[in-house]
Structure formats: C-alpha cells, structure tokens
Amino acid sequence: MTPAAVHAHPALIDTSPKADSIIAASPSMIQLSFSEELIAKFSGIDLKDQAGKRVETGPASTAPKNKKQLTIPVITSLTPGTYTVEWHAVSEDTHRVKGSYSFKISQ
C-alpha cells in the first residue's frame, strides 16, 4: 500500500496590521501571511469600515519568491475607527479558506 496524499488547508499565520491592534495612521497595504503558497487571483479581501461600508482596495498579489504572503494595497486614506478585514484565500492545491479580523486606527 502506498500512503495517501495529505491535503492541508492554508492557515493564516500573521497579519499587518496585526489582528486587534490599534495603529496611529492609515496603512498603505494589508498583508496576510499563510502556511501554504496561494493563488493570488483567487484570493483577496473585503475591507470594511465600522459602519460595514466597503473600502476600496487594489488587487491582491503575491511576490514571485514568497507566494505565502498576500499583499493588498489600500487605495484611500483610512480615517480613525475600527476596520474589518474579511479575507479569502485559495492555496496552490485549490483549497479555499476564509476568515476575518479587525484593527483600529486611533483618534
């Protein structure tokens, strides 16, 4: 018998801004680090303000040498308040995962 292939799902291991953090200024980008390489065109975020309104972001991308890190540019300057990052990611083996976290920009 040959061993069965192991298929893991990508796990979120780090964020920038950090989950539940309070930062002083608007971030220029959101970065998500995962345990597996991702397919950027099938991965991304919805960034929402504290009223639940979607904030404009650019397309998600990965660096050629680090496909485990997803980078999403923030197009507009964010005002003070709480923001929620609703993310979804598809790994190279096509497993899809999703989740969310929040951060706050101080007054």
Regions of interest found by a model, annotated:
Residues V6-S43, Q107:
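N-terminal non-catalytic regions of secreted/periplasmic and cell-surface proteins
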Residues E36, A40-Q107:
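Acidic, low-complexity Ser/Thr/Gly/Pro-rich repeat segments typical of extracellular/periplasmic
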